[in-house]
């Protein structure tokens, strides 16, 4: 390596680490890397300390994969609305063999590594209303997203990981059909859920052996969809579990609230509930008979540490 290049690299490492960042990503070349994937690849496998990556403003069109060996990665954007990680795959888009990519293959970003944190970023699937098109696919355990946006249409956020615990705080999530879906246990704190066109907010596939699925706490459900065009959820698998606590529900929410996905037996196995919903979409007396309104005592059982099995994502 030439002395000048080595000096420049060491200087950048010193400056970025002084700011609390291990790596800086910038499209203009002012960081160590021009792409986020390069920074992901540079994270040492199975490192036992946090690796912090700062991403400068820009639209980064990349299909991202954070490998399972890349743990404790913290990804921070310079500006939530101006630091955009995007790609445009979708379910029926063909791979190099002429086969459909499928829903899982459509994701713009895959997170396999455990203890991942993202802040001040936009994750987008820019393919448009073309069917299933995932913006974020999370399999790793103990994933945290703070002040992030998730943009798409159908199947925007795939909480994929079996046994995975996920936490979303002050995030914006938009979509049409089943745009928050999967088998993971996920807590959504003060998030804005934006309903587009019409459809279903959630499609949990919670396993029978998992006590908690989705918990929305103090969230706001709004959107530009017509009044009465959205269900709070439907069960992708029989034992789906979704609870809304102290949420503001916009006019987009149907009075009946929940759908059983054309399968009568789901009414006996799915666990859907609300507590102190408010707003024009809150209609407890008109909800389907097989969903519940929680008592004060029942609602108190829903705490971060209980739902997330001892993990407190608010602690660094």
Predicted regions and their residues:
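Sequence-level preference for short, compositionally simple segments enriched
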Residues: 21-316
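Boundary at the C-terminal end of the N-terminal hydrophobic targeting segment
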Residues: 16-20
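Sec-dependent N-terminal signal peptides
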Residues: 4-14
